[in-house]
Swiss-Prot record:
It comes from Psychromonas ingrahamii (strain DSM 17664 / CCUG 51855 / 37). It is a lipid-anchor. A lipid is attached at C23 (S-diacylglycerol cysteine). Part of the Bam complex. This is Outer membrane protein assembly factor BamC. The keyword Repeat does not apply. Keywords: Cell outer membrane, Lipoprotein, Membrane, Palmitate, Signal. It is found in: Cell outer membrane. Its main location: membrane.
Length: 374
């Protein structure tokens, strides 16, 4: 009974601790731990040396009083935002943050060739980004390449499902695009015009000054760059889908028998599922970061192979790992592994390869060629 009581008491303590941690409001998460009673502590009086001289007294350790501007920014107690400043995340090449003393945030987009008009590209990207987010354009001057936006609204939940809090951020911005003299580069300046935060409909204190202002502007820049990256990736996938998938037998950098695709990883990753489906491999799982497909083979009837311009091959009805790797040449290796991640025999890898006839290899793998019923 004693052991049961202690166990129950520990369980209760854990539940209470989790509840307290989960109940923390968003604004409390931006503050240091503990109370702020120290601000009420009276300052000590200067040490009196009686009739001795105070010529050696130093004020180096005296705490200076806050200026009015520092008080507005929030340099005291609970007003101090302990979150680290937002950093630029350059997910696309050629983007750097301009170092300046301005209270505005400027990002440079560098061109990689002399024929590239980066200013026009960034302007088009900016218009597309605003439209994709359904943001109203409050003012626009094409001659000055300047846009003022309506409200961006971003909602995010914090905490566990039992103690979830909802934070809503609303903000508007001015974008100004310039082109430095003597170059094809573009400089995008972002200035936040208004910003507010609510935690479960309760207004939070926000200071649009110094580090806080720059963090807000950089968060938007990072979201813009993320959008640009997604557009770029989508465009690359469209190009990949219109290109053939040339495959040959060979060896990887570890001298392992593999299929080699004369294309980069993105192209190979995108188009390989169509080929695997044609060979009667059903996708079970996939992890792009680790570069593998987990597939399950189900042997078709004898008519399937000639109907789909394939040579038959024998393989156990089981699960297999298809591991993709990037070779030094820029090509992609495809390694065949069994369910225990052991390489298939070279003869079996070769047999599966030769099931792909010349009518299929090096041509576009169209969906209509893969959907014939058994």
């Amino acid at each position: 009974m004693s052991k049961f009581y202690k166990s129950g008491r520990v369980t209760t303590a854990v539940i209470v601790a989790l509840s307290l941690s989960a109940c923390a409001r968003f604004d409390a998460r931006t503050q240091a731990n503990g109370d702020f009673d120290y601000v009420q502590t009276p300052r000590g009086e200067h040490y009196q040396t009686a009739h001795f001289t105070q010529n050696e007294a130093r004020d180096i350790y005296d705490i200076p009083a806050l200026t009015e501007q520092q008080k507005r920014i929030g340099f005291l107690s609970s007003n101090v935002d302990i979150r680290p400043p937002t950093q630029l995340i350059p997910v696309i090449d050629g983007v750097v943050l301009e170092a300046n003393n301005s209270d505005k945030t400027t990002v440079l987009f560098n061109a990689f060739n002399h024929t590239e008009n980066m200013k026009d590209k960034v302007w088009t990207l900016l218009e597309s980004y605003i439209a994709a987010n359904n943001i109203e354009v409050a003012a626009k001057d094409s001659n000055l390449t300047q846009i003022e936006t309506g409200m961006f609204r971003h909602q995010q939940a914090y905490g566990s499902f039992l103690f979830r809090t909802k934070v809503v951020r609303e903000s508007s911005y001015r974008f100004t695009l310039n082109q430095p003299q003597g170059g094809q580069n573009a400089a995008l300046t972002v200035e936040v015009l208004s910003y507010s935060e609510k935690n479960d409909n309760v207004d939070l204190k926000v200071n649009l000054t110094a580090r806080s202002k720059k963090s807000i502007e950089l968060r938007l820049v990072n979201d813009l760059l993320k959008y640009a990256y997604q557009l770029k990736e989508s465009s690359e996938l469209q190009v990949a889908n219109s290109q053939p998938l040339p495959i040959k037998l060979g060896y990887d950098d570890n001298n392992q028998m593999v299929w080699i695709v004369d294309a980069d990883f993105i192209v190979s990753w995108t188009k390989l599922p169509d080929l695997l489906a044609l060979l009667r491999f059903e996708q079970v799982d996939a992890d792009k970061n680790l570069g593998y497909y987990l597939v399950k083979f189900k042997a078709p009837n004898a008519k399937y192979w000639p109907e789909n311009n394939l040579n038959s091959f024998e393989l156990d009805n089981a699960e297999y790992f298809i591991q993709l790797g990037e070779l030094n040449s820029g090509s992609t290796s495809i390694t065949w592994l069994d369910a225990d991640k052991k390489p298939l025999a070279d003869e079996k890898v070769t047999e599966i390869y030769f099931s792909i006839t010349s009518k299929i290899r090096d041509v576009l793998l169209l969906n209509e060629n893969q959907s014939k019923a058994l």
